[in-house]
Amino acid sequence: MIQVLLVTICLAVFPYQGSSIILESGNVNDYEVVYPRKVTALPKGAVQQKYEDAMQYEFKVNGEPVVLHLEKNKELFSEDYSETHYSPDGREITTYPLVEDHCYYHGRIENDADSTASISACNGLKGHFKLQGEMYLIEPLELSDSEAHAVYKYENVEKEDEAPKMCGVTQNWESHEPIKKASQSNLPPEQEELLKRYIELVVVADHRMYTIYDGDKTEISSIIYEIVNILTQIFRPLHIRVALIGLEIWSSGELSKVTLSADDTLEAFGEWRETVLMNRKRHDHAQLLTGMIFSGTIEGRTYKSRMCDPKHSVGIVRDHRTRRHFVANRMAHELGHNLGIDHDRDSCSCGANSCIMSATVSNEPSSQFSDCSLNQYLKHIIHYHYTTCLYNEPSKTDIVSPPVCGNYYTEVGEDCDCGPPANCQNPCCDAATCKVTTGSQCAEGLCCDQCKFMKEGTVCRVARGDWNNDICTGQSAECPNKGYYG
């Protein structure tokens, strides 16, 4: 049984609360200074991990008490995760770092169903959390008192004074039919199963980025970890699991052409991916994170509906140094296009000022896809087989840390995971144990109906094009994916 660590944060506010200060995210006009004080409650004799699997923080925001639940993001790395950089003479150096005890977490605020959190606990607490619809950031203050942290609203960060930033993908709605609003949280179980995809992602930092960060490979890696930690959370409502399978730093020079033209840079990166990266690293999609400032206020570029294509399952995104959430938003946007999702129309909404697939990049980035994006994903993406490379779920043993019941991800030793007991809506799953309820055979899967295995011969995935029907076996809740042509 995973022990939950209880950590209490005591808040103390300096007299200069409300004054301006330069923090990692930029110039902040209003902030609170807090002192996290850790109080552990591990059982006697328990082994103390460097970074616990589950943590709980209690603190106050604007004078109101909140409880922040954090769980280690076990979807961040895969077992065959590797990192590659290059010696000054261009020699490839690949390592397989131990990532079991990493320090990147997802979380939620107790009694706030719409809350989210993405936190790095590597050196203090750094990241963001959404509380009562507002985005807050937290980060350590660089003071002699190392325990001091700043908490502030995203809206209090001074915005860049420049022309509106744009996505490089041209609007191309395939249908002029009215968009039917769709909920991201109330899909029937069989539809949730049909939507599941698994993106094994490689992120490449170009030589310009390497130079900007003074050749600090450790810092660059940490930045990419933070970005992908946010990215995995963004895609969860679409039932897409993003796992970082590789990280590459072009430390000796650019390995594909990087220019002011986003189109030329994208094309060159796609060619490099097809001819070089695909031959030495198994993955589904690659993103180039670059220090180049593209012409025309372009922030990113990708190919529309080309996921799984050897040359075109790629994207490029401009780095913004300390604005991790902004970069994660852009990477999610380009991934969305590569999956086939269009820009949002004016009528689309996600409960925020802007959504992931907005054509214009907001200075206050969203972490949510709109109802239109989900509707298009439901209506189009699941009906085509060009994303077949995303069907192969990484082995549950690939995510190399012990299971935690209640994190929505079914891990080794679990039959199901419908989240915390207060949030679980699956009558076939016992949220307290992550086992099927008494009398149930299953709790999830395309071949599971009302907690029972569907009969042998039942079609669980209808043939499209030249593909055959997939058929239930009667012995399992999983829908076999034969993956062959008829």
From Swiss-Prot:
Q: Which residues carry this modification: Pyrrolidone carboxylic acid?
A: Q191
Question: Cellular component per GO?
Answer: extracellular region; plasma membrane
* Pfam families per record: Disintegrin, Pep_M12B_propep, Reprolysin
State its cofactor: Zn(2+)
Q: Which residues form the propeptide?
A: 21-190
Other observations noted = The disintegrin belongs to the long disintegrin subfamily.
Q: State the family named in the UniProt similarity comment for this chain.
A: Belongs to the venom metalloproteinase (M12B) family. P-II subfamily. P-IIb sub-subfamily.
| Quaternary organization | Monomer.
- Name of this protein: Zinc metalloproteinase-disintegrin VMP-II
Instruction: State the species of origin.
Output: Crotalus atrox (Western diamondback rattlesnake)
